[in-house]
């Protein structure tokens, strides 16, 4: 996956998938910071047209545009002003960072981490006009992997139907 926003940052960066450039989208208007490194899985397409979003558990901020190999261990299903917007929860593969290697599914993640992520997702848009987030539910790595597979298929179909392959 590709890092867009480092842990501890309050600037929302987004990679433009067409140009490959990293843009500073906006500063979070609240006093919140990203509780984890945040990015996306390339060559995926959610139903809202965006790549699949991922929060990566870890203690160290990673540089934007970094590529890191991760394993999904859960998913937070949400909806915002633009529609369904899933957030995969992942851990770095063991060779990158063994700190979280014992986590294999959503139920292994400490409640304090889940609560922090949920609070951030639910409130990071609070001071932005006409923006909101609703949390549907947490789910396990099986659904996370299914969502990723569907998004890969959706991306492939999109690319073929738009003559981009």
Kindly give the residue locations of the regions a language model identified.
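Hydrophobic N-terminal alpha-helices or hydrophobic patches in metabolic proteins across all domains
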Residues: 1-165
């Amino acid at each position: 996956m590709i890092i867009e926003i480092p842990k501890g940052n309050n600037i929302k960066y987004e990679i433009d998938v067409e140009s490959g450039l990293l843009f500073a989208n906006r500063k979070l208007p609240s006093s919140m910071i990203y509780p984890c490194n945040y990015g996306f899985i390339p060559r995926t397409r959610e139903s809202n047209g965006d790549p699949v979003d991922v929060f990566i558990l870890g203690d160290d901020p990673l540089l934007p545009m970094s590529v890191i190999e991760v394993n999904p261990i859960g998913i937070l299903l949400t909806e915002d002003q633009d529609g369904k917007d899933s957030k995969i929860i992942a851990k770095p593969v063991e060779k990158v960072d063994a700190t979280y290697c014992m986590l294999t599914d959503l139920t292994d993640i400490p409640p304090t981490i889940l609560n922090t992520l949920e609070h951030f997702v639910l409130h990071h848009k609070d001071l932005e006009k006409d923006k909101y987030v609703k949390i549907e539910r947490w789910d396990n790595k099986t659904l996370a992997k299914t969502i990723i597979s569907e998004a890969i298929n959706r991306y492939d179909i999109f690319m073929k139907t738009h003559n981009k392959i």
